[in-house]
Protein backbone atom coordinates (compact mmCIF):
# COMPACT_ATOMS: atom_id res chain seq x y z
CA UNK A 1 0.00 0.00 0.00
CA UNK A 2 2.90 2.35 0.77
CA UNK A 3 4.39 1.86 -2.73
CA UNK A 4 1.04 2.50 -4.40
CA UNK A 5 0.62 5.65 -2.35
CA UNK A 6 4.06 6.99 -3.34
CA UNK A 7 3.41 6.26 -7.03
CA UNK A 8 0.08 8.04 -6.86
CA UNK A 9 1.63 11.08 -5.18
CA UNK A 10 4.34 11.22 -7.86
CA UNK A 11 1.73 11.01 -10.61
CA UNK A 12 -0.29 13.82 -9.06
CA UNK A 13 2.85 15.99 -8.76
CA UNK A 14 3.73 15.35 -12.43
CA UNK A 15 0.21 16.27 -13.48
CA UNK A 16 0.41 19.44 -11.39
CA UNK A 17 3.74 20.35 -12.98
CA UNK A 18 2.36 19.77 -16.49
CA UNK A 19 -0.63 21.96 -15.75
CA UNK A 20 1.60 24.77 -14.50
CA UNK A 21 3.75 24.48 -17.62
CA UNK A 22 0.65 24.51 -19.83
CA UNK A 23 -0.60 27.65 -18.09
CA UNK A 24 2.75 29.39 -18.51
CA UNK A 25 3.19 28.33 -22.13
CA UNK A 26 -0.07 29.72 -23.37
CA UNK A 27 -0.92 30.11 -27.06
CA UNK A 28 0.72 33.54 -27.13
CA UNK A 29 4.04 32.19 -25.87
CA UNK A 30 3.94 29.34 -28.37
CA UNK A 31 3.32 31.80 -31.23
CA UNK A 32 6.21 33.96 -30.00
CA UNK A 33 8.50 30.93 -29.78
CA UNK A 34 7.62 29.76 -33.30
CA UNK A 35 8.23 33.18 -34.84
CA UNK A 36 11.52 33.59 -32.94
CA UNK A 37 12.71 30.22 -34.28
CA UNK A 38 11.74 31.21 -37.84
CA UNK A 39 13.47 34.59 -37.48
CA UNK A 40 16.62 32.97 -36.09
CA UNK A 41 16.79 30.41 -38.88
CA UNK A 42 16.20 33.04 -41.58
CA UNK A 43 18.89 35.23 -40.04
CA UNK A 44 21.31 32.30 -39.85
CA UNK A 45 20.66 31.41 -43.49
CA UNK A 46 21.17 35.03 -44.52
CA UNK A 47 24.36 35.19 -42.46
CA UNK A 48 25.59 32.02 -44.16
CA UNK A 49 24.93 33.59 -47.56
CA UNK A 50 26.84 36.68 -46.43
CA UNK A 51 29.81 34.51 -45.38
CA UNK A 52 29.84 32.73 -48.75
CA UNK A 53 29.53 36.07 -50.54
CA UNK A 54 32.39 37.51 -48.49
CA UNK A 55 34.62 34.54 -49.35
CA UNK A 56 33.79 35.01 -53.03
CA UNK A 57 34.56 38.74 -52.74
CA UNK A 58 37.94 38.04 -51.12
CA UNK A 59 38.78 35.47 -53.80
CA UNK A 60 37.81 37.98 -56.49
CA UNK A 61 40.05 40.65 -54.95
CA UNK A 62 42.97 38.23 -54.79
CA UNK A 63 42.43 37.09 -58.37
CA UNK A 64 42.44 40.67 -59.67
CA UNK A 65 45.59 41.40 -57.69
CA UNK A 66 47.25 38.18 -58.85
CA UNK A 67 46.63 39.03 -62.51
CA UNK A 68 48.29 42.43 -62.21
CA UNK A 69 51.10 41.05 -60.02
CA UNK A 70 51.87 38.30 -62.54
CA UNK A 71 51.96 40.79 -65.41
CA UNK A 72 54.32 43.10 -63.49
CA UNK A 73 56.42 40.15 -62.33
CA UNK A 74 56.86 38.85 -65.88
CA UNK A 75 58.03 42.24 -67.09
CA UNK A 76 60.46 42.63 -64.21
CA UNK A 77 61.66 39.05 -64.68
CA UNK A 78 62.50 39.88 -68.30
CA UNK A 79 64.72 42.74 -67.14
CA UNK A 80 66.36 40.58 -64.46
CA UNK A 81 67.05 37.88 -67.05
CA UNK A 82 68.68 40.49 -69.30
CA UNK A 83 70.83 41.61 -66.38
CA UNK A 84 71.95 38.04 -65.67
CA UNK A 85 72.72 37.58 -69.38
CA UNK A 86 74.86 40.72 -69.38
CA UNK A 87 76.73 39.55 -66.28
CA UNK A 88 77.47 36.19 -67.88
CA UNK A 89 78.72 37.98 -71.01
CA UNK A 90 80.88 40.25 -68.88
CA UNK A 91 82.42 37.28 -67.08
CA UNK A 92 83.23 35.56 -70.38
CA UNK A 93 84.79 38.76 -71.71
CA UNK A 94 86.95 39.07 -68.58
CA UNK A 95 88.27 35.54 -68.93
CA UNK A 96 88.61 35.42 -72.74
CA UNK A 97 88.55 38.91 -74.33
CA UNK A 98 88.20 39.30 -78.09
CA UNK A 99 91.47 39.82 -79.91
CA UNK A 100 90.43 42.78 -82.05
CA UNK A 101 92.74 45.58 -83.06
CA UNK A 102 90.15 48.16 -82.05
CA UNK A 103 89.96 46.67 -78.55
CA UNK A 104 93.75 46.63 -78.21
CA UNK A 105 93.80 50.26 -79.35
CA UNK A 106 91.19 51.05 -76.67
CA UNK A 107 93.48 49.59 -73.99
CA UNK A 108 96.37 51.68 -75.32
CA UNK A 109 94.18 54.80 -75.29
CA UNK A 110 93.22 54.05 -71.68
CA UNK A 111 96.87 53.90 -70.67
CA UNK A 112 97.39 57.28 -72.32
CA UNK A 113 94.44 59.01 -70.59
CA UNK A 114 94.19 57.25 -67.21
CA UNK A 115 95.89 60.11 -65.39
CA UNK A 116 93.51 62.72 -66.83
CA UNK A 117 90.78 64.15 -64.59
CA UNK A 118 88.10 62.85 -66.97
CA UNK A 119 88.37 60.83 -70.15
CA UNK A 120 86.20 58.98 -72.67
CA UNK A 121 87.05 56.04 -74.96
CA UNK A 122 84.77 55.49 -77.93
CA UNK A 123 85.15 52.93 -80.73
CA UNK A 124 82.08 53.36 -82.90
CA UNK A 125 79.19 55.47 -81.63
CA UNK A 126 76.75 53.65 -83.91
CA UNK A 127 77.77 50.17 -82.73
CA UNK A 128 78.83 50.42 -79.10
CA UNK A 129 78.71 52.71 -76.08
CA UNK A 130 81.67 54.80 -74.92
CA UNK A 131 83.61 54.08 -71.76
CA UNK A 132 83.74 57.11 -69.45
CA UNK A 133 86.31 57.32 -66.68
CA UNK A 134 88.23 59.36 -64.13
CA UNK A 135 91.90 59.59 -63.16
CA UNK A 136 93.95 57.27 -60.95
CA UNK A 137 94.12 60.01 -58.35
CA UNK A 138 90.35 60.25 -58.04
CA UNK A 139 90.03 56.45 -57.84
CA UNK A 140 92.50 56.29 -54.98
CA UNK A 141 90.26 58.57 -52.91
CA UNK A 142 87.39 56.05 -52.79
CA UNK A 143 87.25 53.29 -50.17
CA UNK A 144 85.58 50.78 -52.50
CA UNK A 145 87.47 51.88 -55.64
CA UNK A 146 90.68 50.30 -56.91
CA UNK A 147 92.71 49.87 -60.12
CA UNK A 148 95.08 47.41 -58.54
CA UNK A 149 94.09 44.31 -60.48
CA UNK A 150 95.89 42.28 -63.11
CA UNK A 151 92.87 42.05 -65.40
CA UNK A 152 92.30 45.80 -65.75
CA UNK A 153 92.97 45.68 -69.51
CA UNK A 154 90.52 42.81 -69.88
CA UNK A 155 87.92 44.76 -67.91
CA UNK A 156 88.27 47.72 -70.30
CA UNK A 157 87.66 45.52 -73.33
CA UNK A 158 84.88 43.63 -71.53
CA UNK A 159 83.19 46.96 -70.75
CA UNK A 160 83.28 47.87 -74.44
CA UNK A 161 81.78 44.49 -75.35
CA UNK A 162 79.04 44.93 -72.73
CA UNK A 163 78.44 48.40 -74.12
CA UNK A 164 77.63 46.74 -77.44
CA UNK A 165 75.19 44.36 -75.72
CA UNK A 166 73.66 47.18 -73.68
CA UNK A 167 73.00 49.16 -76.84
CA UNK A 168 71.24 46.18 -78.42
CA UNK A 169 69.25 45.28 -75.30
CA UNK A 170 68.04 48.78 -74.53
CA UNK A 171 64.83 49.90 -76.29
CA UNK A 172 62.26 52.62 -75.77
CA UNK A 173 59.38 50.21 -75.11
CA UNK A 174 61.07 48.79 -72.02
CA UNK A 175 60.39 50.04 -68.48
CA UNK A 176 64.15 50.48 -68.05
CA UNK A 177 65.27 54.07 -68.50
CA UNK A 178 68.99 53.40 -68.09
CA UNK A 179 71.24 50.34 -68.10
CA UNK A 180 74.85 50.68 -66.99
CA UNK A 181 78.01 48.97 -65.88
CA UNK A 182 79.95 50.80 -63.15
CA UNK A 183 83.48 49.61 -62.41
CA UNK A 184 85.44 49.93 -59.20
CA UNK A 185 88.40 50.88 -61.44
CA UNK A 186 87.04 54.37 -62.13
CA UNK A 187 84.95 54.08 -65.30
CA UNK A 188 81.41 53.30 -66.40
CA UNK A 189 79.32 52.44 -69.46
CA UNK A 190 75.75 53.72 -69.66
CA UNK A 191 72.92 53.77 -72.18
CA UNK A 192 72.34 57.34 -71.06
CA UNK A 193 75.11 59.31 -72.80
CA UNK A 194 77.39 61.79 -71.05
CA UNK A 195 77.40 64.77 -73.40
CA UNK A 196 80.34 66.60 -71.85
CA UNK A 197 83.53 65.00 -70.59
CA UNK A 198 83.70 67.44 -67.70
CA UNK A 199 80.53 65.84 -66.29
CA UNK A 200 82.08 62.36 -66.09
CA UNK A 201 83.51 62.67 -62.51
CA UNK A 202 80.24 63.99 -61.12
CA UNK A 203 78.25 61.24 -62.77
CA UNK A 204 80.70 58.51 -61.78
CA UNK A 205 80.67 59.52 -58.14
CA UNK A 206 76.91 59.74 -58.36
CA UNK A 207 76.92 56.07 -59.36
CA UNK A 208 79.41 54.73 -56.80
CA UNK A 209 77.72 56.49 -53.89
CA UNK A 210 74.30 55.00 -54.63
CA UNK A 211 73.00 52.16 -52.38
CA UNK A 212 72.69 49.86 -55.38
CA UNK A 213 76.50 50.06 -55.86
CA UNK A 214 77.63 50.08 -52.22
CA UNK A 215 75.24 47.26 -51.37
CA UNK A 216 77.17 44.79 -53.56
CA UNK A 217 80.40 44.70 -51.62
CA UNK A 218 81.44 41.26 -50.39
CA UNK A 219 80.32 42.19 -46.88
CA UNK A 220 76.91 43.57 -47.91
CA UNK A 221 76.06 40.92 -50.52
CA UNK A 222 77.68 37.66 -49.46
CA UNK A 223 75.53 35.55 -51.79
CA UNK A 224 76.28 37.82 -54.79
CA UNK A 225 72.59 37.81 -55.72
CA UNK A 226 70.40 40.25 -57.60
CA UNK A 227 69.21 43.08 -55.37
CA UNK A 228 66.63 45.84 -55.68
CA UNK A 229 67.07 49.37 -54.35
CA UNK A 230 64.92 52.46 -54.15
CA UNK A 231 66.88 55.68 -54.46
CA UNK A 232 67.12 59.11 -55.95
CA UNK A 233 68.87 59.32 -59.35
CA UNK A 234 72.46 60.43 -59.65
CA UNK A 235 71.44 63.59 -61.56
CA UNK A 236 70.80 66.44 -59.18
CA UNK A 237 68.42 68.08 -61.62
CA UNK A 238 66.19 65.00 -61.70
CA UNK A 239 64.25 64.53 -58.48
CA UNK A 240 62.09 61.65 -59.63
CA UNK A 241 62.63 58.52 -57.49
CA UNK A 242 63.59 55.34 -59.24
CA UNK A 243 63.99 51.64 -58.62
CA UNK A 244 67.30 50.04 -59.53
CA UNK A 245 67.95 46.35 -59.99
CA UNK A 246 71.63 45.49 -59.86
CA UNK A 247 73.98 42.53 -59.69
CA UNK A 248 77.71 42.32 -58.86
CA UNK A 249 80.26 41.26 -61.49
CA UNK A 250 82.85 38.90 -60.03
CA UNK A 251 85.57 36.75 -61.54
CA UNK A 252 88.15 34.65 -59.72
CA UNK A 253 86.83 35.92 -56.36
CA UNK A 254 87.47 39.53 -57.33
CA UNK A 255 84.72 42.14 -57.40
CA UNK A 256 85.04 44.21 -60.58
CA UNK A 257 81.89 46.29 -60.54
CA UNK A 258 78.10 46.39 -60.76
CA UNK A 259 75.64 45.93 -63.61
CA UNK A 260 72.39 47.79 -63.06
CA UNK A 261 69.13 48.90 -64.61
CA UNK A 262 67.19 51.94 -63.41
CA UNK A 263 63.40 52.01 -63.67
CA UNK A 264 61.64 55.32 -62.93
CA UNK A 265 58.53 54.94 -60.80
CA UNK A 266 56.49 56.84 -63.42
CA UNK A 267 57.05 54.00 -65.90
CA UNK A 268 55.94 51.48 -63.27
CA UNK A 269 52.88 53.62 -62.60
CA UNK A 270 52.07 53.70 -66.29
CA UNK A 271 52.51 49.94 -66.45
CA UNK A 272 50.07 49.47 -63.55
CA UNK A 273 47.50 51.67 -65.26
CA UNK A 274 47.83 49.71 -68.50
CA UNK A 275 47.75 46.32 -66.75
CA UNK A 276 44.54 46.77 -64.77
CA UNK A 277 41.07 46.20 -66.14
CA UNK A 278 39.44 49.56 -66.83
CA UNK A 279 36.04 48.14 -65.80
CA UNK A 280 37.24 47.26 -62.31
CA UNK A 281 37.43 49.59 -59.34
CA UNK A 282 40.26 49.59 -56.85
CA UNK A 283 43.69 51.13 -56.52
CA UNK A 284 47.00 49.30 -56.95
CA UNK A 285 50.01 50.50 -54.96
CA UNK A 286 53.60 49.35 -55.17
CA UNK A 287 55.82 49.32 -52.07
CA UNK A 288 59.43 48.32 -51.58
CA UNK A 289 60.66 45.76 -49.04
CA UNK A 290 60.51 48.36 -46.24
CA UNK A 291 56.93 49.31 -47.13
CA UNK A 292 57.97 52.65 -48.57
CA UNK A 293 55.47 53.90 -51.10
CA UNK A 294 56.71 53.84 -54.70
CA UNK A 295 53.77 54.45 -57.01
CA UNK A 296 50.05 53.99 -57.48
CA UNK A 297 47.67 53.25 -60.32
CA UNK A 298 45.39 56.04 -59.11
CA UNK A 299 46.20 59.36 -60.80
CA UNK A 300 44.75 61.17 -57.77
CA UNK A 301 47.49 59.69 -55.55
CA UNK A 302 50.60 59.62 -57.76
CA UNK A 303 52.97 60.35 -54.87
CA UNK A 304 50.71 60.02 -51.85
CA UNK A 305 49.98 57.33 -49.34
CA UNK A 306 46.55 56.51 -48.00
CA UNK A 307 47.87 54.46 -45.06
CA UNK A 308 48.77 56.02 -41.74
CA UNK A 309 51.65 54.63 -39.62
CA UNK A 310 49.32 52.43 -37.55
CA UNK A 311 47.82 50.87 -40.67
CA UNK A 312 51.26 50.32 -42.18
CA UNK A 313 52.28 48.54 -38.97
CA UNK A 314 49.22 46.27 -39.20
CA UNK A 315 50.01 45.57 -42.85
CA UNK A 316 53.66 44.77 -42.06
CA UNK A 317 52.59 42.44 -39.24
CA UNK A 318 50.23 40.57 -41.55
CA UNK A 319 52.91 40.27 -44.25
CA UNK A 320 55.33 38.60 -41.85
CA UNK A 321 53.30 35.38 -41.90
CA UNK A 322 52.46 34.95 -45.58
CA UNK A 323 53.40 36.05 -49.08
CA UNK A 324 49.82 36.98 -49.94
CA UNK A 325 46.66 37.78 -48.06
CA UNK A 326 44.15 40.42 -47.14
CA UNK A 327 43.07 42.56 -44.21
CA UNK A 328 40.14 44.88 -43.47
CA UNK A 329 40.95 48.43 -42.49
CA UNK A 330 37.84 50.38 -41.54
CA UNK A 331 35.82 50.68 -44.75
CA UNK A 332 38.59 49.33 -47.00
CA UNK A 333 39.69 45.84 -47.94
CA UNK A 334 43.44 45.65 -48.55
CA UNK A 335 44.93 42.65 -50.34
CA UNK A 336 48.62 42.18 -51.01
CA UNK A 337 51.03 39.87 -52.81
CA UNK A 338 54.80 39.77 -52.73
CA UNK A 339 56.45 39.83 -56.15
CA UNK A 340 58.83 37.04 -57.13
CA UNK A 341 61.23 39.17 -59.18
CA UNK A 342 61.06 42.41 -57.22
CA UNK A 343 61.98 43.02 -53.61
CA UNK A 344 58.64 44.57 -52.78
CA UNK A 345 54.92 44.04 -52.53
CA UNK A 346 51.92 44.96 -54.67
CA UNK A 347 48.86 46.15 -52.73
CA UNK A 348 45.26 46.48 -53.90
CA UNK A 349 42.94 48.83 -52.00
CA UNK A 350 39.19 48.45 -52.48
CA UNK A 351 36.94 50.90 -50.66
CA UNK A 352 33.40 50.34 -49.43
CA UNK A 353 31.93 52.79 -51.95
CA UNK A 354 33.69 50.94 -54.79
CA UNK A 355 32.42 47.64 -53.44
CA UNK A 356 28.84 48.92 -53.30
CA UNK A 357 29.04 49.98 -56.95
CA UNK A 358 30.33 46.56 -58.02
CA UNK A 359 28.60 43.24 -58.60
CA UNK A 360 29.18 42.00 -55.07
CA UNK A 361 27.77 45.25 -53.72
CA UNK A 362 24.58 44.83 -55.78
CA UNK A 363 24.19 41.25 -54.55
CA UNK A 364 24.81 42.34 -50.95
CA UNK A 365 22.23 45.12 -51.19
CA UNK A 366 19.68 42.74 -52.74
CA UNK A 367 20.36 40.15 -50.03
CA UNK A 368 20.00 42.77 -47.30
CA UNK A 369 16.75 44.09 -48.77
CA UNK A 370 15.35 40.56 -49.07
CA UNK A 371 16.23 39.82 -45.46
CA UNK A 372 14.73 43.14 -44.32
CA UNK A 373 11.56 42.52 -46.37
CA UNK A 374 11.20 38.97 -45.05
CA UNK A 375 11.80 40.14 -41.47
CA UNK A 376 9.28 42.97 -41.85
CA UNK A 377 6.65 40.61 -43.25
CA UNK A 378 7.44 38.13 -40.49
CA UNK A 379 7.02 40.79 -37.79
CA UNK A 380 3.74 41.99 -39.31
CA UNK A 381 2.48 38.40 -39.50
CA UNK A 382 3.58 37.83 -35.92
CA UNK A 383 1.74 40.92 -34.74
CA UNK A 384 -1.48 39.99 -36.56
CA UNK A 385 -1.43 36.34 -35.47
CA UNK A 386 -0.44 37.32 -31.93
CA UNK A 387 -3.41 39.67 -31.70
CA UNK A 388 -5.75 37.02 -33.13
CA UNK A 389 -4.47 34.36 -30.74
CA UNK A 390 -4.65 36.78 -27.82
CA UNK A 391 -8.25 37.71 -28.65
CA UNK A 392 -9.18 34.06 -29.12
CA UNK A 393 -7.49 33.16 -25.85
CA UNK A 394 -9.37 35.92 -24.02
CA UNK A 395 -12.61 34.78 -25.63
CA UNK A 396 -11.88 31.17 -24.75
CA UNK A 397 -11.08 32.11 -21.16
CA UNK A 398 -14.29 34.12 -20.95
CA UNK A 399 -16.38 31.27 -22.35
CA UNK A 400 -14.65 28.79 -20.09
CA UNK A 401 -15.31 30.98 -17.06
CA UNK A 402 -18.96 31.34 -18.04
CA UNK A 403 -19.22 27.59 -18.52
CA UNK A 404 -17.81 26.92 -15.05
CA UNK A 405 -19.29 29.81 -13.04
CA UNK A 406 -22.64 31.22 -12.11
CA UNK A 407 -22.70 34.71 -13.62
CA UNK A 408 -24.86 36.15 -10.85
CA UNK A 409 -22.96 34.95 -7.79
CA UNK A 410 -19.58 34.43 -9.51
CA UNK A 411 -19.32 31.07 -7.76
CA UNK A 412 -18.93 27.69 -9.44
CA UNK A 413 -22.10 26.35 -11.02
CA UNK A 414 -23.44 22.89 -10.23
CA UNK A 415 -21.55 21.06 -12.99
CA UNK A 416 -18.22 22.76 -12.25
CA UNK A 417 -18.62 22.17 -8.52
CA UNK A 418 -19.14 18.46 -9.06
CA UNK A 419 -16.08 18.35 -11.37
CA UNK A 420 -13.99 20.03 -8.67
CA UNK A 421 -15.38 17.96 -5.83
CA UNK A 422 -14.65 14.48 -7.17
CA UNK A 423 -10.83 14.80 -7.55
CA UNK A 424 -10.61 16.64 -4.21
CA UNK A 425 -12.52 13.86 -2.49
CA UNK A 426 -10.33 11.25 -4.13
CA UNK A 427 -7.18 13.10 -3.09
CA UNK A 428 -8.38 13.32 0.52
CA UNK A 429 -9.24 9.64 0.48
CA UNK A 430 -5.77 8.82 -0.84
CA UNK A 431 -4.07 10.78 1.94
CA UNK A 432 -6.64 9.69 4.57
CA UNK A 433 -7.68 13.27 5.20
CA UNK A 434 -11.25 14.17 6.16
CA UNK A 435 -13.56 15.59 3.51
CA UNK A 436 -16.57 17.68 4.52
CA UNK A 437 -19.55 19.28 2.75
CA UNK A 438 -21.78 22.19 3.77
CA UNK A 439 -25.18 22.67 2.17
CA UNK A 440 -26.61 26.22 2.49
CA UNK A 441 -30.19 27.34 1.80
CA UNK A 442 -31.43 30.92 2.27
CA UNK A 443 -34.51 31.18 4.47
CA UNK A 444 -37.72 32.70 3.09
CA UNK A 445 -36.07 33.55 -0.24
CA UNK A 446 -39.30 32.99 -2.20
CA UNK A 447 -41.03 35.57 -0.03
CA UNK A 448 -38.32 38.11 -0.81
CA UNK A 449 -38.79 37.48 -4.53
CA UNK A 450 -42.56 37.78 -4.26
CA UNK A 451 -42.46 40.91 -2.13
CA UNK A 452 -39.54 42.86 -3.55
CA UNK A 453 -39.15 41.34 -7.02
CA UNK A 454 -36.58 39.22 -8.75
CA UNK A 455 -34.13 42.09 -8.95
CA UNK A 456 -33.99 42.26 -5.20
CA UNK A 457 -33.68 38.49 -5.09
CA UNK A 458 -30.69 38.60 -7.37
CA UNK A 459 -29.06 41.18 -5.11
CA UNK A 460 -29.69 38.94 -2.11
CA UNK A 461 -28.09 35.97 -3.87
CA UNK A 462 -25.05 38.03 -4.90
CA UNK A 463 -24.72 39.43 -1.36
CA UNK A 464 -24.97 35.98 0.19
CA UNK A 465 -22.40 34.52 -2.22
CA UNK A 466 -19.92 37.24 -1.29
CA UNK A 467 -20.37 36.59 2.43
CA UNK A 468 -19.99 32.84 1.95
CA UNK A 469 -16.78 33.29 -0.06
CA UNK A 470 -15.27 35.60 2.56
CA UNK A 471 -15.88 33.00 5.28
CA UNK A 472 -13.97 30.17 3.60
CA UNK A 473 -10.38 29.01 3.75
CA UNK A 474 -8.06 29.22 0.75
CA UNK A 475 -8.49 25.55 -0.14
CA UNK A 476 -12.29 25.52 0.21
CA UNK A 477 -14.58 25.59 -2.83
CA UNK A 478 -18.08 27.08 -2.99
CA UNK A 479 -20.75 26.86 -5.65
CA UNK A 480 -24.38 27.59 -6.38
CA UNK A 481 -26.29 24.34 -6.90
CA UNK A 482 -29.85 25.61 -7.07
CA UNK A 483 -32.02 28.72 -6.90
CA UNK A 484 -31.11 29.82 -3.39
CA UNK A 485 -29.00 26.80 -2.50
CA UNK A 486 -25.22 26.84 -2.13
CA UNK A 487 -22.73 24.07 -1.51
CA UNK A 488 -19.34 24.38 0.13
CA UNK A 489 -16.56 21.76 -0.16
CA UNK A 490 -13.99 21.64 2.63
CA UNK A 491 -11.10 19.26 1.83
CA UNK A 492 -9.10 18.31 4.92
CA UNK A 493 -11.71 19.68 7.36
CA UNK A 494 -13.20 17.49 10.06
CA UNK A 495 -16.90 17.52 10.96
CA UNK A 496 -16.26 19.85 13.88
CA UNK A 497 -14.20 22.25 11.75
CA UNK A 498 -16.82 22.20 9.03
CA UNK A 499 -19.52 22.97 11.60
CA UNK A 500 -17.49 25.95 12.80
CA UNK A 501 -17.18 27.24 9.23
CA UNK A 502 -20.91 26.77 8.75
CA UNK A 503 -21.65 28.69 11.94
CA UNK A 504 -19.37 31.49 10.77
CA UNK A 505 -21.27 31.67 7.48
CA UNK A 506 -24.61 31.71 9.31
CA UNK A 507 -23.54 34.55 11.58
CA UNK A 508 -22.20 36.67 8.72
CA UNK A 509 -25.39 36.24 6.73
CA UNK A 510 -27.63 37.06 9.68
CA UNK A 511 -25.78 39.91 11.29
CA UNK A 512 -25.66 42.25 8.27
CA UNK A 513 -28.63 44.09 6.90
CA UNK A 514 -28.72 44.87 3.22
CA UNK A 515 -30.41 47.68 1.28
CA UNK A 516 -32.74 46.30 -1.38
CA UNK A 517 -34.82 49.38 -2.12
CA UNK A 518 -35.01 53.05 -1.21
CA UNK A 519 -35.08 53.24 2.60
CA UNK A 520 -35.79 49.51 2.76
CA UNK A 521 -33.39 47.04 4.38
CA UNK A 522 -33.75 43.39 5.25
CA UNK A 523 -31.82 40.86 7.27
CA UNK A 524 -31.42 37.44 5.73
CA UNK A 525 -30.74 34.10 7.34
CA UNK A 526 -29.82 30.64 6.17
CA UNK A 527 -30.12 27.04 7.23
CA UNK A 528 -27.02 24.90 6.88
CA UNK A 529 -26.40 21.18 6.85
CA UNK A 530 -22.97 19.68 7.41
CA UNK A 531 -21.61 16.21 6.59
CA UNK A 532 -18.16 14.64 6.68
CA UNK A 533 -16.38 11.49 5.59
CA UNK A 534 -15.34 10.99 9.23
CA UNK A 535 -18.80 9.72 10.08
CA UNK A 536 -19.01 6.73 7.73
CA UNK A 537 -15.65 6.67 5.92
CA UNK A 538 -17.52 7.37 2.68
CA UNK A 539 -15.78 9.85 0.35
CA UNK A 540 -18.46 9.85 -2.31
CA UNK A 541 -19.31 13.52 -2.85
CA UNK A 542 -22.87 12.93 -3.97
CA UNK A 543 -23.58 10.84 -0.88
CA UNK A 544 -22.04 13.46 1.37
CA UNK A 545 -24.01 16.25 -0.35
CA UNK A 546 -27.23 14.25 0.01
CA UNK A 547 -26.51 13.77 3.72
CA UNK A 548 -25.76 17.48 4.16
CA UNK A 549 -28.95 18.35 2.28
CA UNK A 550 -31.01 16.11 4.56
CA UNK A 551 -29.52 17.78 7.62
CA UNK A 552 -30.24 21.18 6.05
CA UNK A 553 -33.94 20.34 6.02
CA UNK A 554 -33.63 19.14 9.59
CA UNK A 555 -32.32 22.62 10.41
CA UNK A 556 -35.28 24.21 8.63
CA UNK A 557 -37.72 21.97 10.51
CA UNK A 558 -36.01 22.96 13.74
CA UNK A 559 -36.78 26.63 13.14
CA UNK A 560 -34.37 27.84 10.41
CA UNK A 561 -31.31 30.08 10.86
CA UNK A 562 -29.24 27.31 12.38
CA UNK A 563 -26.57 24.71 11.59
CA UNK A 564 -27.26 20.98 11.68
CA UNK A 565 -24.22 18.69 11.76
CA UNK A 566 -25.89 15.42 12.83
CA UNK A 567 -29.06 13.47 12.25
CA UNK A 568 -30.02 13.92 15.90
CA UNK A 569 -30.22 17.74 15.77
Swiss-Prot record:
Mg(2+) binds at residues 441, 484. It is found in: Cell inner membrane. One of its GO terms (molecular function) is metal ion binding. Its EC number is 2.7.7.65. It comes from the Bacteria. It is a multi-pass membrane protein. Keywords: Cell inner membrane, Cell membrane, Cellulose biosynthesis, GTP-binding, Magnesium, Membrane, Metal-binding, Nucleotide-binding, Transferase, Transmembrane, Transmembrane helix. Pathway: Glycan metabolism; bacterial cellulose biosynthesis; Purine metabolism; 3',5'-cyclic di-GMP biosynthesis. One of its GO terms (biological process) is cell adhesion involved in single-species biofilm formation. It catalyses: 2 GTP = 3',3'-c-di-GMP + 2 diphosphate. The chain crosses the membrane at residues 25-45, 365-385. PROSITE patterns: GGDEF (PS50887). It is an enzyme of class 2 (transferase). Substrate binds at residues 449, 454, 458. The keyword Transmembrane helix applies. Residues 433-568 form the GGDEF domain. The active site is at 484 (proton acceptor). One of its GO terms (cellular component) is plasma membrane. The record marks 446 as: Transition state stabilizer. Pfam families: CHASE7 (PF17151), GGDEF (PF00990). Catalyzes the synthesis of cyclic-di-GMP (c-di-GMP) via the condensation of 2 GTP molecules. Cyclic-di-GMP is a second messenger which controls cell surface-associated traits in bacteria. Involved in the regulation of cellulose production. Homodimer. This is Probable diguanylate cyclase DgcQ. The gene is dgcQ.
Amino acid sequence: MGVVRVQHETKMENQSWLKKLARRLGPGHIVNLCFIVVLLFSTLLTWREVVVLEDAYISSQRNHLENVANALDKHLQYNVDKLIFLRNGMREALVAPLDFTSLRNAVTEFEQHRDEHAWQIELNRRRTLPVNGVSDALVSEGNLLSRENESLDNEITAALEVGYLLRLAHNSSSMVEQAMYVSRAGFYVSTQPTLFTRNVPTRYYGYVTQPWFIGHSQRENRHRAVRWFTSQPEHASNTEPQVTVSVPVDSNNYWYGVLGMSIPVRTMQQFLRNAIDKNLDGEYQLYDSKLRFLTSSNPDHPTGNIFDPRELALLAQAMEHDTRGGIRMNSRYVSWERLDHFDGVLVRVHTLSEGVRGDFGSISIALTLLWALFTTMLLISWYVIRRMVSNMYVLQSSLQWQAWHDTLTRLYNRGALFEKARPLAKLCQTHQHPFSVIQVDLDHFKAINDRFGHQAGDRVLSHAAGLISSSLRAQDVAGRVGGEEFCVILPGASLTQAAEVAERIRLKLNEKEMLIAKSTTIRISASLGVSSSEETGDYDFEQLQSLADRRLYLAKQAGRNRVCASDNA
